[in-house]
């Protein structure tokens, strides 16, 4: 079914369903892939920058970290105004590791295009690779047309499919390391020699001392992953957390922006994670009967 609420193995326990504002979300056990809670998880939604998880997957599978990519005119100038960028310069040479850091931490759209063109020769060819990979890992309702999630009506996914991508990406040590960082300094280059470019994470769940928000969205068990926002997609996130012997993935799509801007997604993730950690252990997840 499209919307199925998980319940605890312990029948004597009254499991309260997590309260989420998001119209489409899912909670998955990272190790087994078991779905612990879902709401409209197979409904097609715009993924915004959570798309970049797939871009990172293909980068990690097709490149060496010390490989150098050169930014084209298209990579620099095809990003619409107001979308996040790493101020990459035309002709600038950056390593794959540097590009992955700015792709995943501040969500740089220009970095996504540099990577796509480096790997596949064009955005279109890279999108085909993205779609093939999505099918390979089990996605059922996903179609990509670009590497960054800039809005396009033919660019969509689902909470379930994005959870699969998150689960797949978290198998890479480099991905796990990068998405857990709260900031990154991109060193000066020949094309940008002013100073280091400093970037902060877009993920409120891992910002321990985040004073610019009226509420603290930090979650002590959060381990990272990827946010997204466009006017059409609203607020999105694929988030990961680990407590004791359980690692979880939460996906929240098209979330409200009424509570302190973008961070309603953080509150929804907290609710999902708390539900999972309070009602499941590794043993109950493994033994849970598939419905």
Question: What is each residue range found by the language model?
Answer:
Residues 2-160, 164-173, 178:
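Active-site-adjacent loops and short helices of periplasmic peptidoglycan-processing enzymes
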């Amino acid at each position: 079914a499209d919307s199925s609420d998980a319940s605890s193995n312990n029948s004597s326990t009254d499991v309260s369903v997590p309260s989420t504002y998001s119209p489409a979300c899912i909670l998955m056990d990272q190790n087994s892939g078991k779905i612990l809670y879902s709401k409209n998880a197979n409904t097609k939604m715009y993924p915004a920058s959570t798309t970049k998880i797939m871009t990172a997957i293909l980068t990690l599978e097709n490149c060496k970290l010390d490989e150098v990519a050169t930014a084209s005119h298209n990579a620099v100038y095809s990003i619409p105004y107001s979308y996040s960028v790493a101020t990459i310069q035309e002709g600038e040479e950056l390593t794959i590791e540097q590009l992955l850091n700015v792709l995943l931490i501040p969500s740089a759209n220009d970095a996504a295009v540099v990577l796509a063109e480096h790997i596949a020769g064009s955005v279109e060819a890279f999108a085909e690779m993205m779609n093939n990979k999505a099918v390979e890992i089990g996605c059922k309702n996903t179609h990509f047309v670009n590497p960054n999630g800039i809005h396009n009506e033919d660019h969509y996914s689902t909470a379930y499919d994005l959870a699969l991508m998150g689960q797949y990406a978290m198998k890479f040590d480099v991905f796990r390391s990068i998405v857990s960082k709260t900031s990154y300094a991109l060193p000066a280059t020949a094309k940008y020699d002013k100073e280091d470019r400093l970037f902060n994470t877009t993920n409120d769940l891992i910002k321990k001392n985040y004073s610019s928000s009226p509420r603290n969205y930090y979650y002590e068990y959060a381990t990272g992953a990827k946010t997204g926002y466009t006017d059409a997609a609203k607020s999105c996130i694929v988030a990961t957390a680990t407590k004791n012997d359980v690692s979880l993935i939460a996906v929240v799509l098209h979330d409200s922006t009424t509570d302190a801007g973008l961070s309603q997604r953080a509150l929804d993730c907290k609710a999902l994670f708390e539900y999972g950690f309070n009602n499941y252990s590794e043993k109950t997840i493994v033994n849970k009967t598939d419905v």
